[in-house]
Design a protein with these regions (language model features):
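Flexible, low-hydrophobicity surface segments
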Residues: 1-145, 167-170
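Short glycine-rich loop/turn motifs
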Residues: 90, 183-188, 279, 438-443, ...
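Glycine-rich loop/linker segments at domain edges
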Residues: 10, 16-22, 146-187, 193, ...
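Phosphate/diphosphate-binding loops
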Residues: 106-107, 257-301, 513-529
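C-terminal catalytic domains of large/alpha subunits in multi-subunit enzymes
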Residues: 71-72, 218-225, 253-259, 288, ...
Length: 699
């Protein structure tokens, strides 16, 4: 054990790492509670309609089956704030995969057999699941995800675009994408004899799950405990409560025993959200020297009939490049599809793919280096709000990345480099992600033996949150990080926001920093030995996080990629990929690099392998498991490097940090797509860039 304080930013190893690799860390579906039963959800097999009958006799006759819950016998719940949680409350089927029953048995295999033994009949009505750019049901919502105005108009875009001597007018298409965390969405629920509900849940935010369950089951928040000590990823899909927690709690109440429900992988696409498909038209007008004079980004996407969710893909165009004349808009149509939701960098990931691809097309039209074009249009103030940036080091990221990557040696001519049948190319794209922070509470405790304890209902979804929070506290307390215990992932701890929006560490860390600072002050007032119970202080950052900042706060980055395109097979391989990021003060260099590279890997998947399709006839996602939905494997993601700019930004939070969980994916797909264009001379505007699409374009 080290006895010297480590500087904030040191590459401290994850403190739970050994427990995870040895199996000591227990996830939501690994608890083996005494008397635990197992549940299997039953999805609707029609795309739209209602259930007319569910015959349960055959299922209940199977050995070990204890119960079948349907809309006819499930507990009635209160009105949820999220309609996707209103499961088993009526006979409605808004989309294929909507859960219509749950079977509970002694074993998982028995529950699955019971589900297969159910006989369900439906009344169907016409359905529609395919998004088109000219869909008759398109409308303009009031806001897009994040509360952003759906439309924004600055100056006279039409006039400026018409007058621009150089124009780009292109449309980019991305299909639905799925989060697919390693750990499926899982819950284990049990009720005490006194009526207290405890749920072990695979969630990005136990506080919100607790509050939702309390509302649904008519309980006070203090009658519900939600525990999420270890979570195997989420990428946004566990950022809101999901139906498995409700179904497990229902089944546990009905049977009087603990119930475990792990969502089957093939069910997840229809239940836990997805990145909505987008059709994005981007128009750029520029002077011949590359100065942008007109920017338009218009997005078409889908939502469900259950609730509205609008992917904010046009919002990044409001902050990236300066132009007095701009138009950004979102239009959406409600289809008979599962409800879309957050997926790593919602809005920014698809939006920056389209925008950065269009910027590359503009560079080609101008005959200008794509790095130089971005540098010439780097604004001093945020174009949307006109606020000064708290810090904007995009130019430094581009320059540093270009130097590290060897960009100056690039032959700008498309299709100029070959290795036998392989066509080689390089591409670049910029990245941005907003800086968020939410109100959080934390507790700091000093024990008489000189150790410290931090408590905050944060969630570690694989990011290393425990470790970083210990580092923040240790820095303030001027003690070795091993001298600080961190308790997280329990709704009985001080309330804290979810792990999402790249805001978790900023939010929780702010409250931990404040609590630790208050503890130092309290200890400074104590001249004698500590009492046997120690000293405890709490902190609340509601006031600080609610204060409006006079600055526009964003993280920035730049991606550089080199690809090899096999002219015989159409296969694209990323030979190397380099990202440079400006994300405030990096709090742990080891976990930060992991986050950056993880995001870049997801961007690679978005560009080359990940694809999902809604079946027009049957209404479901045809790529519903990892055999058909292809996430990158380790062999696909070799040669990835992540670096960062040391950034001192005093306008953020006490740590000077920006979020890093999402910016790695932003722009990554565009850099790869731009590299494919440079290799082949062909511009493909539909993701992913699969071999069949490359071959069709090549020949």
């Amino acid at each position: 054990m080290s006895h010297a304080p480590q500087p904030l930013g040191a590459p401290v190893a994850r403190r739970e790492g050994r427990d995870k690799v040895t199996g000591a860390a227990r996830y939501a579906a690994e608890l083996n509670l005494p008397g635990c039963l197992y549940a299997w959800p039953v999805p609707a097999t029609v795309p739209h309609g209602r259930v007319t009958a569910i015959r349960t006799a055959d299922a209940l006759a199977l050995p070990g089956v204890h119960a079948v819950l349907t809309h006819e016998n499930a507990p009635r719940t209160g009105e949820p704030d999220d309609p996707i949680l209103a499961v088993l409350q009526n006979d409605r089927v808004p989309h294929r995969g909507w859960q219509i029953a749950v079977v509970v048995a002694d074993t998982l295999e028995g529950a699955r057999a019971g589900a297969e033994a159910l006989h369900v009949t439906y009344e169907t009505v016409p359905h529609e699941v395919v998004l088109t750019a000219d869909h008759a049901g398109l409308y303009t919502p009031e806001t897009a995800n994040g509360g952003y105005p759906a439309e924004r108009e600055r100056g006279d875009f039409d006039g400026a675009f018409a007058a621009a001597p150089v124009q780009v007018d292109t449309t980019y298409t991305i299909g639905p994408l799925h989060n697919h965390p390693m750990e499926p969405h899982s819950s284990t629920a049990h009720w005490s004899p006194e009526g207290h509900l405890t749920v072990y849940d695979s969630s990005q935010g136990a506080t919100k799950v607790r509050d939702s369950l309390a509302t649904l089951f008519g309980l006070r928040p203090d009658q519900v405990t939600v525990i999420s000590r270890h979570v195997g990823g989420g990428f946004g899909s566990k950022g809101t409560p999901r139906p498995q927690a409700v179904l497990a709690a229902m089944a546990a109440r009905h049977t009087g025993r603990p119930v475990e429900l792990a969502m089957p992988r093939r069910h997840m696409a229809a239940v836990v959200g997805h990145r909505a498909p987008t059709v994005q038209r981007v128009r750029l007008g520029a002077e011949r020297d590359g100065t942008l004079t007109a920017v338009a980004h218009e997005v078409i996407t889908h939502t469900s009939t259950v609730k509205e969710f609008v992917e904010q893909a046009a919002v990044p165009a409001r902050v990236m490049y300066g132009s007095a004349h701009s138009r950004t808009s979102h239009r959406v149509t409600a289809l008979d599809v599962p409800s879309p939701s957050w997926m790593r960098a919602p809005g920014e990931a698809p939006g920056m793919y389209a925008l950065e691809s269009a910027v590359d097309e503009l560079a080609t039209a101008l005959g200008l280096d794509p790095v130089e074009l971005r540098l010439r249009n780097d604004p001093a103030d945020e174009p949307d709000s006109c606020k000064p940036f708290s810090s904007r080091n995009l130019a430094a990221c581009l320059r540093d990345g270009a130097a590290r990557f060897g960009w100056s040696d690039r032959d700008p001519r498309p299709g100029a480099r070959r290795e036998g049948p392989l066509l080689l190319g390089t591409g670049v794209a910029a990245a941005t992600y907003p800086v968020y922070a939410s109100a959080s509470h934390a507790l700091a405790h000093a024990a008489p033996d000189g150790s410290y304890r931090i408590a905050v209902n944060a969630t570690d979804i694989g990011t290393g949150a425990r470790t970083v929070l210990a580092q923040i506290a240790a820095r303030v307390l001027e003690t070795p990080v091993d001298n600080v215990t961190v308790d997280i992932g329990d709704s009985d701890l001080p309330d804290a926001p979810l792990a999402g929006g790249s805001s978790g560490t900023a939010s929780w860390g702010w409250s931990v920093h404040k609590a630790a600072t208050a503890l130092v002050e309290r200890l400074g007032e104590n001249s004698g030995p500590l009492p046997a119970v120690g000293v405890t202080v709490t902190a609340d950052t509601t006031e600080e996080t609610a204060a409006e900042s006079p600055y526009a706060r964003h993280a920035f980055g730049a991606h550089f990629a080199e690809v090899a395109v096999d002219s015989r097979t159409g296969e694209v391989r990323v030979r190397r990929m380099l990202g440079v990021f400006a994300a405030g003060h990096i709090l742990n260099s080891r976990t930060a690099r992991s986050q950056f590279i993880g995001g870049m890997t997801m961007g690679l998947g978005m560009a080359l392998t990940e694809s999902s399709t809604l079946d027009a006839a049957f209404g479901d996602f045809t790529e519903s498991d990892l055999a058909s939905y292809h996430v990158p494997a380790c062999a696909d993601a070799t040669g990835l490097e992540a670096h960062w700019i040391d950034e001192d930004d005093p306008h953020l939070n006490p740590m000077g940090s920006k979020g890093i969980g999402e910016i790695g994916i932003v722009g990554a797909a565009a850099a790869i797509g731009n590299a494919v264009h440079h290799a082949t001379g062909l511009r493909l505007r539909t993701l992913p860039l699969t071999p069949d699409r490359l071959l069709s374009a090549l020949y």
